[in-house]
């Protein structure tokens, strides 16, 4: 873990020179925990071992969340690893997606990933305990568990994702959503359609902004602090989308629709959910019906978490 501590002290930024960061791994190769190839006779036993490790890792994430209100950044970690997927590229891992590539410095310095080094620092100690759990899996497990522990729906997850081997396999910058594009609706569709997601899934996934805050020093958006964030929990400051920003519910849609509180954040890509006719159908529904939102969100989150993933075994590993 010495490499992690050294990086945290030094810091990473979008301005860091890529030649010195390209291919940078946050842990040593010995800690990678990549599963060796197994014969058919031992595959079932190996899968059973991995399942047990995944269950233990999930419990560790739950314990982390009890002591550290880091739900939002863990959700973001899983999303940003998976959200680089391009359905038009068939070759793995060039297609991007949930493949653990976000652990490399060359991808961490993408502007959209600013601040995610802190999330890696939270999950790497858990990952390092379980040799059979990949980075791709721990990122998605942490994300789904954070949603559930914040009061959200149970996500129908599967595991067994393969990791990319090095930073040379990271996706190019620019595949993740921006907060203030010239045409918000067009931008959201360009990004999410590239992943193979629908208008309904765009709106449902946007509802995860019920968790967390925007910080101007990271994204350029949000107030330095508000009455909802000035005292934490966790590090104080930033501007949240909802008043209870560690609780997963449908309040994001209610607040975006009403826009009555200046202390709550509304990005252009939030506002457009009630401005675009196709998006509005779903946003209105979710503002009125939390159960419908939870059902659609769980399905969309699971779909996102599988994008671009290569599973071993091919059908994945369920913990339910």
UniProtKB/Swiss-Prot annotation:
A GO cellular component annotation in the UniProt record: chloroplast stroma
EC number: 1.11.1.11
Keyword field: Calcium, Chloroplast, Heme, Hydrogen peroxide, Iron, Metal-binding, Oxidoreductase, Peroxidase, Plastid, Potassium, Transit peptide
Residue interval of the organelle targeting sequence: 1-42
Expression induction: Down-regulated by hydrogen peroxide in leaves.
Enzyme class of the recorded protein, top EC level: oxidoreductase
Residues given in the record as K(+) binding sites: 210, 242, 249
Tissue specificity statement from the Swiss-Prot or TrEMBL entry: Expressed in leaves, stems and flowers.
Reactions the enzyme catalyzes: L-ascorbate + H2O2 = L-dehydroascorbate + 2 H2O
UniProt cross-references to SUPFAM superfamilies, sorted A to Z: Heme-dependent peroxidases (SSF48113)
CDD domains the record matches: ascorbate_peroxidase
Biased composition, class Basic and acidic residues, residue ranges: 214-228
Residues at which heme b binds: 209
Site positions per UniProt: Transition state stabilizer: 76
Cofactor entry: heme b
One Pfam short name: peroxidase
Region (Disordered): 213-241
Cofactor note: Binds 1 heme b (iron(II)-protoporphyrin IX) group.
Subcellular location: Plastid, Chloroplast stroma
Cross-referenced InterPro entries: Ccp1-like (IPR044831), Haem_peroxidase (IPR002016), Haem_peroxidase_sf (IPR010255), Peroxidase_I (IPR002207), Peroxidases_heam-ligand_BS (IPR019793)
Calcium listed as a keyword: yes
Record GO biological process: cellular response to oxidative stress; hydrogen peroxide catabolic process; response to reactive oxygen species
Similarity comment: family membership: Belongs to the peroxidase family. Ascorbate peroxidase subfamily.
PANTHER family assigned to the protein according to its UniProt record, in alphabetical order: L-ASCORBATE PEROXIDASE S, CHLOROPLASTIC_MITOCHONDRIAL (PTHR31356:SF1), THYLAKOID LUMENAL 29 KDA PROTEIN, CHLOROPLASTIC-RELATED (PTHR31356)
Any further remark recorded for this protein: Binds one cation per subunit; probably K(+), but might also be Ca(2+).
Protein name: Probable L-ascorbate peroxidase 5, chloroplastic
Gene that specifies this protein: APX5
């Amino acid at each position: 873990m010495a490499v992690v501590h050294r990086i945290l002290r030094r810091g990473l930024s979008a301005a860091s020179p890529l030649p010195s960061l390209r291919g940078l791994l946050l842990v040593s190769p010995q800690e990678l925990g990549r599963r060796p190839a197994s014969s058919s006779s031992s595959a079932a036993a190996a899968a059973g071992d991995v399942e047990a490790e995944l269950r233990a890792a999930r419990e560790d994430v739950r314990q982390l969340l009890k002591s550290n209100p880091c739900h939002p950044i863990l959700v973001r970690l899983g999303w940003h690893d998976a959200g680089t997927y391009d359905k038009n590229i068939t070759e793995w891992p060039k297609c991007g997606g949930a493949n653990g590539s976000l652990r490399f410095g060359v991808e961490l310095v993408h502007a959209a990933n600013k601040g995610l080094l802190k999330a890696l620092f939270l999950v790497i100690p858990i990952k390092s305990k379980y040799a059979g759990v990949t980075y791709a899996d721990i990122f998605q497990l942490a994300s789904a568990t954070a949603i559930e522990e914040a009061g959200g729906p149970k996500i129908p997850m599967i595991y067994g994702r393969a990791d990319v081997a090095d930073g040379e396999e990271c996706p190019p910058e620019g595949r993740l959503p921006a907060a203030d594009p010239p045409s918000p609706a067009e931008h959201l569709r360009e990004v999410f359609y590239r992943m193979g997601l629908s208008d309904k899934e765009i709106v449902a996934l946007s509802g995860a902004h019920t968790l967390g805050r925007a910080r101007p020093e990271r994204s350029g958006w949000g107030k330095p602090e508000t009455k909802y964030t000035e005292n934490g929990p966790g590090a104080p400051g930033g501007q949240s989308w909802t008043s209870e920003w560690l609780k997963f519910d449908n309040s994001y849609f209610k607040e975006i629709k009403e826009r009555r509180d200046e202390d709550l954040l509304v990005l252009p890509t939030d506002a457009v959910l009630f401005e675009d006719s196709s998006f509005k159908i779903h946003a209105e529904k979710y503002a009125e019906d939390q159960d419908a939102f939870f059902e659609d969100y769980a399905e969309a989150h699971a779909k996102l978490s599988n994008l671009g993933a290569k599973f071993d075994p091919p059908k994945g590993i369920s913990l339910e």
